[in-house]
C-alpha cells in the first residue's frame, strides 16, 4: 500500500546513505500504484515517485528509476511543481544511464512538457546530444557548457557517469568496427586530446 510515509522513509535512507535499507525496502519500491492509502495526496505521490526514483538510482537500477521519475512527470497537474522539475532532471539522467530513449510524449499535458523542458534546458540538451551520431563528443560539449548547472543541481556525479558511459560505448563501437585502428586515431575518434588520455 502506498502511504504518505513512504517518501519520508526513502528520503531518510538516501540522506543517511543507508543503501542496505533501500535494498531491503523492496516492499515500498514494488508496491502497486493502485493500492493507495486514503490519506495520500498529490504531493505525497510526487515525492514518493521522486525519492523512489532516487533510491533506485542509488541501487543502480536505472530502467526502474526512469519509470518512477516518469510516473512523477505524468501525474495530472495544472501547474508545474518543483518536484516535477527535479524529477525531469533525474529522469533525463536515468534514461541515459539505462540506455533508453527518453519519451516525453507520455507526459500528461503539452504545457507541462514544454515548461519542464524549458526549465531544464541543460538536461534537454543532454538528451538531444545522446541521440546524435557522435554522442560521446556531443555529450562532452554539453557537459562542459552546462557544468555549473549540473553542479548546482547536485547531479554532477550522474552527469559524469553518463559522459563516461558514452565514451565507453563509443570505444566498444570502434573496437567492433576497426580491429586494427591506431591508438592516435582511436583517441581522436573518441574525443580525447592525446594518446596518453586514451591509454588511461
Feature annotation, model-predicted:
Residues 23, 44-199:
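Alpha-helical scaffold segments of alpha-solenoid architecture
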Residues 3-10, 22, 26, 45, ...:
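Hydrophobic, well-ordered secondary-structure segments
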Residues 1-3, 16-23, 38-43, 60-63:
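Alpha-helix boundary/capping segments in eukaryotic regulatory proteins
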Residues 1-16, 98-99, 103-112:
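Charged/polar interaction segments and conserved charged motifs
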Residues 7-17, 51-55, 93:
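Tandem amphipathic alpha-helical repeat scaffolds
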Residues 1, 32-40, 77-79:
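Flexible helix-coil transition and linker loops at the boundaries of alpha-helical arrays
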Residues 14-32, 64-70:
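Helix-turn-helix repeat elements of alpha-solenoid scaffolds
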